[in-house]
Every structure is written in structure tokens, then in C-alpha cells.
Amino acid sequence: MPSVGVKLYSVFFKFLLKHRLQNRIQSSGDESSSDPFGVTTRPEESVAAPNPLFTDGVATKDIHIDPLTSLSVRIFLPESALTPLEPSTSACVYSGKARTLNNIAGSDLLSRRNSLGSSNSLLSHKVESRRNSYGYTTGSSSPEAGSSDVYRGYAPSSSGGNSRKLPVMLQFHGGGWVSGSNDSVANDFFCRRMAKHCDIIVLAVGYRLAPENRYPAACEDGFKVLKWLGKQANLAECNKSMGNSRRPGGEVKKSEVNKHIVDAFGASLVEPWLANHADPSRCVLLGVSCGANIADYVARKAIEVGQNLDPVKVVAQVLMYPFFIGSVPTQSEIKQANSYFYDKPMCILAWKLFLPEEEFSLDHQAANPLVPGRSPPLKFMPPTLTIVAEHDWMRDRAIAYSEELRKVNVDAPVLEYKDAVHEFATLDMLLRTPQAQACAEDIAIWAKKYISLRGHEFSY
């Protein structure tokens, strides 16, 4: 059984959640509450500021990718992306030049898991001055102290010739459609953990919340980010091609290259972290709670559009305690309807806020993954890892979905965690528990099967 602390926190959590849901329902009755631009976080949410330095092994930055909506992403770039192609040395960027750190046994600096603790504190102290000088744009080797007009974050080398390419993970946070955010303290911690364990670039998606934006806004936002990732890859390739092209008498000027890119793709900027370090042909989707429903939607849309997404390829997805429901209750829905943190009545309220009133049904295609007529056929779905908790009333439907995938020969294992509750690996209070740590390691072990073997991954 969960600990006494978890039980007490669950009571407090459910009280606050019920109060917030009721307030949202009251406000949703006012037509003025509809906002096409949308919101991606709530005032009560504790957020973590982005940090473009590798202070704990992962650098982060926020990008607003759609001028018409509030859709945004937070990029989590692990320090392992700076490892040069030569395995004998590791690279740091110092005053715009590459310097090497030799004779570091076991490459402790780049250890993903050790960087969660403080075992590297002495070494990190020695290189802190170098990390603070990442990406100075003034051209000077030591900008004035206290200068506020100088970017001190990581900036890849303009040549990009020695860049290491990492797979990409699109992460969709939970929160019952109406709360949560990609930059919350809890989600920031979880994404940093996944970036280190999986050795992967994480894009945490800040999708629009309900009731200001109802279905399919959040799901479409998820797919829009996948298309944006493909556009970034094409922009980077175009930039590289134009930069390498020559004309009689000299090289093409950078300004002229940028003009050609703008003419071809519109006024979109190439994201340097992704251009230098991302391999979109190895893309994993990971969704937490209702975010798992978004991940499943994005996977289905990716199958429908097929090669139009090139070079992006979804090679696997991870569904963490998905927010599935249906009109016919399962065994766990009957026995554990009043379980910890998210009980069934409150989740139904959340679905009423998310689905348009005229479309509300517990068998809506966004709610029930096993309704007849849902496309595409399950046999085309990517390998799917499902994480479930013992004390979660949504468990049985997630397991049933996984069983249907296995019937059509999709690799779809289920990992069930004993004495665990919904969001046991992502909720703020539970993030540092042994179960949460073990879950992250299990996800990394499974995901690496599909992101490490080039040429053997799933493709549509």
C-alpha cells in the first residue's frame, strides 16, 4: 500500500483539484472564456526558469513556435551532445573555441545518471568557468562581469562539423487537460531525468489547456510540434546546402543564404540546438496521463501522413498511465474508482471540460482507444511501452489497449509498478522516490532498443 504521506497528500491534492475543476466548469459557461490563443500554464503552477548552461548536465531553452497560439516547447539538451565524434576525448566550448578534457577516466563528466546527484561536484567546479562562457556573441574571450546584453548560454559552433546527433523525444505533460505545463518544476525535473537516462533531446510540449481550448486543440498542438520538428530539419539541411554552395569568385555570403531560406520556407529561424544535434529520424513520443492520449493521437496522425513527415520518423512511443476511459467500466474502474489523486468522478469532470459539449462521450475516440472504427489499424502503430500503477483505476483499460496491440504483432509490453499510484513517476512529491527512478531507467532501457539501432527501427 502507498505510504501514509502519500495518502495524506492525495487527500489534499484531490481537494484542490476538485475546487479548481468546479471553478473551470463555472467559467466555461461564459463564452468569453474561449481564447483561440490559449494558455499553456496556470497562475498556481510553480514553474522552472530555462537554463541554457549545462549546470546539471542538461541545458534548456523555451521557444514559442506558433505566432497564432500559445503553443511552445522547452528543449532539453543533454551535455552528452557535446561529445565529439572521436571517442577518446570529450569537448567543452570555451570562448568560442573547442578545448578538450583529457584523461578523465570513465567519462564521469558525461555520465547521465551520476549527474542526478553530487558525485561530480569537484569536477564540475573546475570546469564551471568554461561552462559560463558558452556561446558568447561579442567575440571577446572574457565579457565584462555583470553584462546583461551578452548571451551566456550554449551556442553550437557555426561549422557544426563535429556535432553529435541525438534522437529526439516529444514529451506531453499531464494535468487532466486543464492544468500542468511543460515548464513546471516537476515536469522540468522529469524531462531532465529522461534526457540524461535516454541520452536524448527532449522537447516538452506546452499545448493549449481546456476549457479555453477544447478538443482537438491540445492534440493538434502535439502534431504541430512534430511537423515543426520536420521543418526545422529541412531548414537546417537547406542552410547547410546553401552555405556549402559556391559561385565563381567566392563563397555565397551568409546573408544571401538566409535570404534564400526565407524565400523558400518563410521567415522561420533555424533552431541551432536542433540543427546541430537532433536526429529527427529517431523520434520517440512520451505522454504522461492525458499527455499519453496526445502521444497516441500524434502517433496515429504520423502514420496517416506517412512520408510527408520526412525526415521525421516516429520509432516508438511510451504511454505513462494513460488517461483512458470508456462507457463500460472495467474491473479496476469499479474497484478503485475512488483511488489516489485522480478519482473517477473528477476525471469525468475533466473530460467534460476538454470535449466540446456536443461531442461529450466516454467513448469518444480521444477517451477510449478501443472504440470501433478508430483509424488507422492497430497493426500500423509503433512499438508502444505502457506504464501502469497498481492503485490506478485507469490501469485495466491501458492494459487492454496494450493487449490489442500485441494481438497484431506490435511490440507493446506493459510495466506495472506495485504499490504505485497514478503519476507516481511524475508528480512533484513522488519524483525522487525509488519507484520513480526505477521507472525512468526502465523506460530508457526499452527506448534505446529503437533509438540506438539505425536501420532497424520501426517505420510506417
Swiss-Prot record:
Region (Disordered): 26-52, 132-161
Biased composition (Polar residues): 26-35, 132-145
Keyword Heme: no
Pfam families: Abhydrolase_3
Motif (Involved in the stabilization of the negatively charged intermediate by the formation of the oxyanion hole): 173-175
Active site per UniProt: S289, D392, H422
Catalytic activity: a carboxylic ester + H2O = an alcohol + a carboxylate + H(+)
InterPro entries: AB_hydrolase_3, AB_hydrolase_fold, Carboxylest/Gibb_receptor
Tissue-specificity statement: Expressed in roots, leaves, stems, flowers and siliques.
EC class name: hydrolase
Alphabetic keyword roster: Hydrolase, Serine esterase
Segments traversing the membrane: none
Gene Ontology molecular functions: carboxylesterase activity
Highest taxon listed in the record's lineage: Eukaryota
Gene3D superfamilies named among the record's database cross-references: alpha/beta hydrolase (3.40.50.1820)
EC number(s) recorded for this UniProt protein: 3.1.1.1
Family annotation (PANTHER family): ARYLACETAMIDE DEACETYLASE, CARBOXYLESTERASE 11-RELATED
Function text: Carboxylesterase acting on esters with varying acyl chain length.
Family: Belongs to the 'GDXG' lipolytic enzyme family.
Name assigned to this protein: Probable carboxylesterase 11
Gene from which this protein is expressed: CXE11
